[in-house]
């Protein structure tokens, strides 16, 4: 039984729900969902706009250089936190150095490590293992030579001297012209009028280094025949009669033998062929006039080369002429048994700065010798080449003016001695 004082609780039944009406979502959760979607769309829009602005102001290569740009690089080590860039490797040594102690190993304990004792190097270096040879040092790049490096360095003073030498040569060539065989023969004819003892030997065809000895011997043989009253055996000159030639041989005491020389031909026939070719071209080329004076009265052979050693060295030429002088002593002996002597006239290059004045220099030296055969006029030559050729030019003008009145390529008439 229940006590009457206790209140009796009654349960009120719930009203019945209509099953035909749909269940609606509450308005508060719906508003939260819309806010999330709007914030997400706004964030995406801001990201897109930011990337678009970045693309407008930077190129693709600039984007790659940014530190946040993703670049995949192969890595052999895994770093737990931050990857530290490795330093550039130093070039390996060709030969290991055992004397250098290895670097101490640094450990990273929680407490400071004790100092590691230094390891003393071994007394003798250990040889590298044959299986692992030491790496070779990198080869240094070859220096690239430019066109300026290939050309030798020429000082400025050399160019100045070359310019002065060219100007000096032009002045000298304008002062003294080249003399051919015709002018030289006319000059000899003019000298004969001044010195009757000189015989004007023809210079065409001229003597050469291959036949000048035979020509001298032939003239001396003909002179002996004339003195004996015998007919001459040698060939007569082209522009001289036999009677006039005999008178010249009878009274001559000096033979001026002009030699034409070219360094290329090695025989007499080749020399004559080269002479013809240069005459057709109208050029002197490398030809050169030489002079051999046969002084019969003084018993002397005088050799003059204005280029000093163009044919051969003066020592070799003197030996050759001394041998020839012994031969002349037998061909044309003296009454008092005096022997022929040899003299090399030039002691240096006379025609400095000129390549075509050799013929004029030979005539100038012959003129000096005719005036005084015992005085060496070459010792009084000016040192300056221009001044030296100016003096030669005055001699050339005097000779050219004197030979104008002489007949063309005809021997002057010699006077009979008895």
From Swiss-Prot:
Residues 1-10 have a biased composition (Polar residues). It comes from the Bacteria. Residues 1-23, 75-145 are annotated as: Disordered. The keyword Hydrolase applies. Residues 86-141 have a biased composition (Pro residues). Gene3D superfamilies: Adenoviral Proteinase, Chain A (3.40.395.10). The chain crosses the membrane at residues 40-60. Its EC number is 3.4.22.-. GO terms for molecular function: cysteine-type deubiquitinase activity; deNEDDylase activity. GO terms for biological process: protein deneddylation; protein deubiquitination; proteolysis. It is a single-pass membrane protein. Keywords: Hydrolase, Membrane, Protease, Secreted, Thiol protease, Transmembrane, Transmembrane helix, Ubl conjugation pathway, Virulence. InterPro entries: Papain-like_cys_pep_sf, Peptidase_C48_C. The active site is at residues 288, 305, 358. GO terms for cellular component: extracellular region; host cell; membrane. Its main location: secreted. It is found in: Secreted; Host cell; Membrane. Belongs to the peptidase C48 family. Effector proteins function to alter host cell physiology and promote bacterial survival in host tissues. This protease possesses deubiquitinating and deneddylating activities. This is Deubiquitinase and deneddylase Dub1. It comes from Chlamydia trachomatis serovar A (strain ATCC VR-571B / DSM 19440 / HAR-13). The gene is cdu1.
